[in-house]
């Protein structure tokens, strides 16, 4: 084994990936952690949520890398990657690009996936591309993850959605202060999440296309019946839930709508939390070796507020598969 992507303790660069399009896709990839000493040694891959970048996961990667090799990448048109070559940005197309990225750098399974929010839909489309998914993906951690029915059943009414428009979600949810990033890391998150990058004109369009195709991508995934088939069994998986209603409550409070209809808001949040909990628990069906963890101090971004909880759960999975 003489592949720097499997041996270097730290490496990051823009990788040119052949995606069978008019031009290659430039994808930013980073890796931290001890060298891979055998081909069967599991490595971790982090898949971010919709329109999000690897900057959110710097603390988790830093905590894990002393003992586990961890790869992070920015999807096309986001963060430090090049502009997106292929549109629309469906989960299926992004899973294909992920597959080609790791083929290009010569990093093969077994993988342990750490996936957040809509990233779970992309990762599960990646599973669908594998001829032997349970042999290739030996463990998964789903953090505040979407599933097939999320976009159908978790709905914010139009007049409540309108009340949230124009708010800075990082500030309004308290996440701007309640996190474990350094000052420089927070600045980097704000920079790349806002689209103020070198390729400014394209960054928002890729993000918007991801958001616009979330519901159709979830429907396409449902047709694969992965939950019913328990496609990762008996591999260990964990579903880790935060509390997105904590974020929503803070947003509503900042917008002033809590004062206008507190009873309606509380009823909505109670229903939202109940449905969200049930939807996330259904992901456990992917494997008979699955467990549910409730984060106690987090909203949607558990990686920002409780990275040590994620780290501990990944280490537990690693012990089970090694």
Curated annotation (Swiss-Prot):
<dbReference type="GO" id="GO:0016787">
    <property type="term" value="F:hydrolase activity"/>
</dbReference>
<comment type="pathway">
    <text>Mycotoxin biosynthesis.</text>
</comment>
<comment type="similarity">
    <text>Belongs to the AB hydrolase superfamily.</text>
</comment>
<feature type="domain" description="AB hydrolase-1">
    <location>
        <begin position="36"/>
        <end position="319"/>
    </location>
</feature>
<dbReference type="InterPro" id="IPR000073">
    <property type="entry name" value="AB_hydrolase_1"/>
</dbReference>
<comment type="function">
    <text>AB hydrolase superfamily protein; part of the gene cluster that mediates the biosynthesis of gramillins A and B, bicyclic lipopeptides that induce cell death in maize leaves but not in wheat leaves. The nonribosomal peptide synthetase GRA1 incorporates respectively a glutamic adic (Glu), a leucine (Leu), a serine (Ser), a hydroxyglutamine (HOGln), a 2-amino decanoic acid, and 2 cysteins (CysB and CysA). The biosynthesis of 2-amino decanoic acid incorporated in gramillins could be initiated by a fatty acid synthase composed of the alpha and beta subunits FGSG_00036 and FGSG_11656.</text>
</comment>
<dbReference type="Pfam" id="PF12697">
    <property type="entry name" value="Abhydrolase_6"/>
</dbReference>
<keyword id="KW-0378">Hydrolase</keyword>
<dbReference type="InterPro" id="IPR029058">
    <property type="entry name" value="AB_hydrolase_fold"/>
</dbReference>
<protein>
    <recommendedName>
        <fullName>AB hydrolase superfamily protein FGSG_00044</fullName>
        <ecNumber>3.-.-.-</ecNumber>
    </recommendedName>
</protein>
């Amino acid at each position: 084994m003489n592949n720097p992507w499997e041996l270097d303790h730290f490496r990051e660069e823009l990788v040119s990936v052949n995606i069978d399009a008019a031009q290659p896709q430039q994808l930013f990839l980073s890796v931290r952690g001890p060298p891979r000493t055998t081909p069967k040694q599991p490595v971790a891959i982090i898949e971010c949520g919709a329109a999000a970048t690897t900057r959110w996961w710097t603390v988790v990667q830093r905590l894990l890398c002393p003992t586990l090799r961890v790869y992070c990448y920015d999807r096309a048109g986001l963060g430090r990657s090049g502009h997106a070559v292929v549109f629309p940005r469906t989960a299926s197309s992004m899973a294909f690009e992920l597959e080609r990225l790791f083929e290009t750098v010569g990093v093969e399974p077994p993988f342990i996936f750490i996936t957040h929010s809509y990233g779970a839909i992309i990762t599960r489309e990646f599973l669908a591309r594998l001829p032997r998914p349970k042999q290739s993906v030996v463990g998964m951690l789903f953090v505040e993850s979407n599933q097939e029915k999320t976009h159908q059943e978790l709905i914010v009414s139009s007049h409540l959605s309108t009340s949230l428009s124009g708010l800075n979600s990082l500030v309004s949810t308290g996440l701007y202060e309640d996190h474990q990033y350094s000052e420089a890391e927070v600045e980097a998150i704000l920079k790349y999440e806002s689209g103020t990058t070198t390729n400014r004109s394209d960054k928002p369009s890729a993000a918007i296309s991801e958001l616009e195709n979330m519901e159709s991508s979830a429907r396409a995934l449902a047709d694969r019946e992965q939950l019913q088939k328990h496609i990762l069994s008996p591999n260990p998986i964990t579903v880790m839930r935060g509390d997105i209603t904590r974020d929503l409550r803070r947003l509503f409070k900042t917008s002033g709508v809590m004062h206008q209809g507190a009873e309606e808001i509380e009823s909505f949040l109670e229903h939202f939390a109940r449905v969200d909990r049930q939807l996330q628990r259904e992901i456990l069906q992917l494997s008979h070796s699955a467990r549910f963890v409730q984060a106690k101090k987090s909203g949607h971004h558990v990686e920002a507020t409780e990275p040590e909880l994620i780290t501990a759960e990944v280490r537990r999975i690693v012990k089970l598969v090694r």
